[in-house]
């Protein structure tokens, strides 16, 4: 073993995320003075099958404190992995999974395990003196992802009457990530002015992910605002739309409650079909309830667009395998904190790619200044990244990191219209 990579110290602490809720930060230091730090995010609409964040459930922070998770890193995980070579990512992740011993990482907490997992990778990259994306992906990592920018919020992310959770723009006609960010930012500013004119200044406050939450009632109203803004910005041919329905949130007792109507699965499919016919929608995430593999298979067959599984798959290899067998969805939303280790997240991405599925590397609604997912999207050549509107520091941190990576790479390829299969 090259002793420069030996893990010399691990320190965990409680910090806060973009919603002011506590989360876990971990620092890993190697003997070669490689330093890696990671802060984990958390979601608002979470899948039932996600790995579990450990919360203290005491008075501090309204029960959301993470001191138990921090203590688990410092007193249980740390002694077990001190002295390990930081490049032994899979072995270290496996040790933590076995130490936890539960199927959903509920004993030590997925927030504790993931923070260590990511910090180890960063410390190894720093010791090797190479960027994280190159350390994780090697020299074949050169595809810059198309951003899915969540510019209008509904559902659990907003206080309006929109049932669908996210209305996103994708600058597929750009030629680079820096141009894509510029296009997205320009559309975002036009959208702000359009909303301001129609609904007044109270309608342009931003939500958790930097998007606006105007007082809208229907998806068509939101999509009309996007259409008008894209046209005014001059990007009709370059910018397309994506939706995150987060349908588990409006599903109850076998029915979907959308825009005041009680819909069956088939009626909801017709609703999506009509939207896709009317607007340039190229991707829909979680169109049905998280257990409705058949519904996902049906919409994937019926609509010639990207269908993304988030709550359906929760970045879990077993659930993804089931989806692949049933031809349910054709893309995976990759959230490292849904599964809890870097190794397992990469396994899920590789399984998706091998079976012709797209991969969208994603943030959470409760984010931090950590930029790991930007590097991960390039490392995997995922072709797509979902990291919010071009606003709020915890979102723009990822875009700025992608711009840095693009400049550093020199010869990179922007995924563009081939976002689902960039090769």
Curated annotation (Swiss-Prot):
This is Enolase. Binds a second Mg(2+) ion via substrate during catalysis. Catalyzes the reversible conversion of 2-phosphoglycerate (2-PG) into phosphoenolpyruvate (PEP). It is essential for the degradation of carbohydrates via glycolysis. Its EC number is 4.2.1.11. GO terms for molecular function: magnesium ion binding; phosphopyruvate hydratase activity. Keywords: Cytoplasm, Glycolysis, Lyase, Magnesium, Metal-binding, Secreted. It catalyses: (2R)-2-phosphoglycerate = phosphoenolpyruvate + H2O. Homooctamer formed by a tetramer of dimers. (2R)-2-phosphoglycerate binds at residues 165, 335, 364-365, 386. One of its GO terms (biological process) is glycolytic process. Its cofactor is Mg(2+). It is found in: Cytoplasm; Secreted; Cell surface. Pathway: Carbohydrate degradation; glycolysis; pyruvate from D-glyceraldehyde 3-phosphate: step 4/5. The active site is at 209 (proton donor), 335 (proton acceptor). Gene3D superfamilies: Enolase-like C-terminal domain, Enolase-like, N-terminal domain. CDD domains: enolase (cd03313). The lineage of its organism: Archaea, Methanobacteriati, Methanobacteriota, Methanomada group, Methanococci. Disulfide bonds: none annotated. One of its GO terms (cellular component) is cell surface. It holds the Pfam family Enolase_N. The covalent binding to the substrate causes inactivation of the enzyme, and possibly serves as a signal for the export of the protein. The gene is eno. Belongs to the enolase family. Mg(2+) binds at residues 244, 285, 310.
């Amino acid at each position: 073993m090259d002793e420069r990579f030996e893990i010399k110290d691990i320190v965990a602490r409680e910090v806060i995320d973009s919603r002011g809720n506590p989360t876990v930060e971990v620092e890993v230091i190697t003997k070669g003075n490689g330093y890696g730090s990671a802060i984990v995010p958390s979601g608002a609409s979470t899948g039932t099958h996600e790995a579990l964040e450990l919360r203290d459930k005491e008075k501090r922070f309204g029960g959301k404190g993470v001191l138990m998770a921090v203590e688990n890193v410092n007193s249980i995980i740390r002694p077990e992995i001190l002295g390990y070579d930081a490049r032994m990512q899979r072995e270290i992740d496996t040790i933590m999974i076995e130490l936890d011993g539960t199927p959903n990482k509920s004993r030590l907490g997925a927030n504790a395990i993931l923070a260590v997992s990511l910090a180890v990778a960063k410390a190894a990259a720093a010791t090797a003196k190479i960027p994280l994306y190159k350390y994780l992906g090697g020299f074949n990592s050169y595809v810059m992802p198309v951003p899915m920018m969540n510019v209008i919020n509904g559902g659990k992310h907003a206080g309006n009457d929109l049932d669908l959770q996210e209305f996103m723009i994708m600058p597929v006609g750009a030629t680079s990530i820096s141009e894509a960010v510029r296009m997205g930012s320009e559309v975002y500013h036009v959208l702000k002015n359009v909303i301001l004119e129609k609904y007044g200044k109270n309608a342009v406050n931003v939500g958790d992910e930097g998007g606006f939450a105007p007082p809208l009632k229907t998806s068509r109203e939101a999509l009309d605002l996007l259409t008008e803004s894209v046209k005014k910005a001059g990007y009709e041919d370059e910018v397309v739309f994506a939706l995150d329905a987060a349908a588990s949130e409006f599903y109850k007792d076998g029915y979907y409650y959308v825009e005041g109507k009680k819909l069956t699965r088939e009626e909801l499919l017709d609703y999506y079909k009509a939207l896709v016919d009317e607007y340039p929608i190229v991707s829909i995430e979680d169109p049905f309830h998280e257990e409705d593999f058949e519904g996902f298979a049906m919409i994937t067959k019926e609509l010639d667009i990207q269908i993304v599984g988030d709550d359906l798959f929760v970045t879990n290899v077993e659930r993804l395998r089931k989806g692949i067998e049933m031809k349910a969805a054709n893309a995976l939303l990759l959230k490292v904190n849904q599964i809890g280790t870097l190794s397992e997240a990469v396994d899920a991405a590789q399984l998706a790619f091998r079976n012709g599925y797209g991969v969208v590397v994603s943030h959470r609604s409760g984010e931090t200044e950590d930029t790991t997912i930007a590097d991960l999207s390039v490392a995997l050549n995922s072709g797509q990244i979902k990291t919010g509107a071009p606003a709020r520091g915890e979102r723009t941190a990822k875009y700025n990191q992608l711009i840095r990576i693009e400049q550093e790479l020199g010869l990179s390829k922007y995924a563009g219209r081939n976002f689902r299969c960039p090769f």
